[in-house]
C-alpha cells in the first residue's frame, strides 16, 4: 500500500471509530460564545471577556478599525470596538479571530503546511467577503451577514487540522505535501462536519463545510455560494469543468459583476479592505 493510501486508510478508520483527535475551540472563543448567548450580556461585559486574551483584544481593535468596516474615525478601546462591530456580530468575529491559535505544530513540515493552510483560508475568506459586500450593495435586504460568512469561510476546511496532526505523528511517512493535499481533498469535509458538530456550531456553518465543493445551487443565495466563488477564484474548486456554468449562474443572480470578477475594481477594493482585518 502506498503512503498516500495508507494515510487515507488510517484517517478513515479512526474517523469511523471515533478515534480521531479533534481540535478543541480555543478557550477564549468558548468564553465569548457563552457570553454572547447570555440574554443579559451588555457591551461592557463582552469587552471584559475579550480583554482576558490580549491577542484577541488586539485583533478586535484591528477589525473595528479596518477599512472593511469603512469608518474613518479610529477606536482606541475595546468597548468602542465591540460597539462598532456589534454585540451580536462579535460572537462570530471573535471566534474567527481566535482560530489562528489552532494552526500550530511542533514538526517543521507540518507547521509549514498549517501556516500555508491558514494563509489560503484567509485568502478564501477575503474573496468571499468581497463578493458578499458587492452583492449586498444591490440586495439591501438579503438575510446574509458578513460576520457569519467570515466565520463560515474560516472553518470551511477546518477538517484539515486533524489530518495534519495525524501526519505529525508519522512525519517520515506522511509529512509529504502531495499525500497531505490528497487526504485534505478527500476527507476534510467529513472531518470538518464532525468538528463543527463537536463545537456546537449551527447548521449554517456545517452546510458550508459539507457543500462548498459540490454543485448544488438554488435560487436562494446562501453562504456556500460565496465560499464556492472564492474557491473558484483561487483555483481550489475541485470540479474545474463545471466552473463556467457556476459562474454564469452567479453572474445572473448578481453575486458577481462579471465572470472574471476578481478584475472588477469594486470587488478588488472590497478584497483589499477585507485583508486589513487579518494583517
Question: Which residues does each PLM region occupy?
Answer:
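Conserved alpha-helical "signature site"
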Residues: 1-155, 162-169, 175-177, 183, ...
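Terminal helices and disordered tails flanking the catalytic cores of nucleotide-processing hydrolases
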Residues: 5-14, 254-279
Amino acid at each position: 500500500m502506498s503512503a498516500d493510501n495508507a494515510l487515507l486508510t488510517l484517517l478513515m478508520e479512526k474517523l469511523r471509530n471515533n478515534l480521531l483527535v479533534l481540535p478543541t475551540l480555543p478557550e477564549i472563543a468558548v468564553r465569548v460564545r457563552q457570553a454572547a448567548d447570555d440574554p443579559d450580556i451588555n457591551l461592557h461585559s463582552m469587552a471584559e471577556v475579550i480583554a482576558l486574551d490580549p491577542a484577541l483584544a488586539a485583533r478586535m481593535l484591528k477589525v473595528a478599525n479596518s477599512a472593511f468596516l469603512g469608518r474613518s474615525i479610529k477606536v482606541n478601546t475595546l468597548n468602542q470596538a465591540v460597539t462598532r462591530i456589534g454585540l451580536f456580530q462579535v460572537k462570530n468575529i471573535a471566534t474567527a479571530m481566535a482560530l489562528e491559535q489552532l494552526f500550530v505544530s511542533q514538526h517543521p513540515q507540518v507547521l509549514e503546511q498549517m501556516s500555508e493552510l491558514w494563509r489560503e483560508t484567509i485568502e478564501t475568506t477575503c474573496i468571499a467577503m468581497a463578493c458578499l459586500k458587492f452583492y449586498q450593495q444591490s440586495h439591501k435586504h438579503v438575510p446574509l451577514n458578513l460576520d457569519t460568512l467570515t466565520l463560515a469561510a474560516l472553518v470551511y476546511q477546518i477538517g484539515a487540522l486533524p489530518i495534519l496532526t495525524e501526519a505529525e505523528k508519522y512525519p517520515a511517512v506522511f509529512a509529504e505535501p502531495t499525500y497531505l493535499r490528497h487526504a485534505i481533498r478527500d476527507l476534510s469535509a467529513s472531518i470538518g462536519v464532525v468538528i463543527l458538530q463537536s463545537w456546537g456550531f449551527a447548521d449554517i456553518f456545517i452546510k458550508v463545510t459539507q457543500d462548498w465543493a459540490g454543485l448544488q445551487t438554488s435560487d436562494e443565495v446562501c453562504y456556500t455560494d460565496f465560499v464556492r466563488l472564492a474557491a473558484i477564484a483561487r483555483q481550489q474548486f475541485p470540479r474545474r469543468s463545471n466552473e463556467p456554468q457556476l459562474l454564469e449562474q452567479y453572474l445572473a443572480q448578481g453575486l458577481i459583476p462579471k465572470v472574471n470578477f476578481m478584475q472588477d475594481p469594486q470587488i478588488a477594493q472590497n478584497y483589499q479592505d477585507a485583508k486589513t482585518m487579518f494583517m
